[in-house]
Amino acid sequence: MARSILVLHGPNLNLLGTREPEVYGSRTLAQINEDLSSLANELGVSLSAWQSNHEGALVDRIQAASKDGTDFIIINAAAYTHTSVALRDALAGVAIPFIEVHLSNLYKRESFRHHSYLSDIAVGLISGLGADGYEAALRYAVRH
């Protein structure tokens, strides 16, 4: 059975391509997900991508991952990275390994973005590589 990878996208990532392209790039979330799906097929893994602007919905999806056979999570929690103890607790509670991904370099941004509630429990952190960060995370997840 192929490994199952879940990609979670947090709030406002549905606006990629139009929201601050100088910070987040010009690629849409649909384009990023299509590229990830193609790469997953090449690598022989199952990939599911899901986005929500709502913290509770993201928590629910993380909890569901513990029952649906998800082997690894790639998460860009976006703004919730810096505020959500609930996401942290959900990720810790399901004990599925995960990588935290950010399109922009958090440390070149406002100081409130320098703290993550997720990083210390993540397998790794990829920040500032744009959409390529998701690809790097997927390649790692397949080998983990």
Swiss-Prot record:
Which positions are annotated as binding substrate?
A: N76, H82, D89, L103, S104, R113
Entry EC number(s) = 4.2.1.10
Kindly list the residues the record flags as site (Transition state stabilizer): R19
The residues responsible for catalysis, as annotated, are Y24 (proton acceptor), H102 (proton donor)
Any Gene Ontology biological process: amino acid biosynthetic process
Concerning CDD domains, the annotation shows: DHQase_II
Q: Its domain of life?
A: Bacteria
Q: Specify the enzyme's EC class, one word.
A: lyase
User: Which pathway, metabolic or otherwise, does it act in?
Assistant: Metabolic intermediate biosynthesis; chorismate biosynthesis; chorismate from D-erythrose 4-phosphate and phosphoenolpyruvate: step 3/7
Which Pfam families does this UniProt record tie to the protein?
DHquinase_II (PF01220)
Record keywords: Amino-acid biosynthesis, Aromatic amino acid biosynthesis, Lyase
Record field: catalytic activity: 3-dehydroquinate = 3-dehydroshikimate + H2O
Indicate yes or no for the key word Transit peptide.
no
Alphabetized InterPro entries for the sequence:
DHquinase_II, DHquinase_II_CS, DHquinase_II_sf
Picking any one GO molecular function of the record gives:
3-dehydroquinate dehydratase activity
Which family is annotated?
A: Belongs to the type-II 3-dehydroquinase family.
Q: Which PANTHER family does the entry mention?
A: CATABOLIC 3-DEHYDROQUINASE
Q: Known HAMAP family for this protein? A: AroQ
Quaternary structure and interacting proteins, as annotated: Homododecamer.
Free-text function comment from the UniProt entry: Catalyzes a trans-dehydration via an enolate intermediate.
Q: What is this protein called?
A: 3-dehydroquinate dehydratase
Q: What organism does the record attribute this protein to?
A: Bordetella avium (strain 197N)
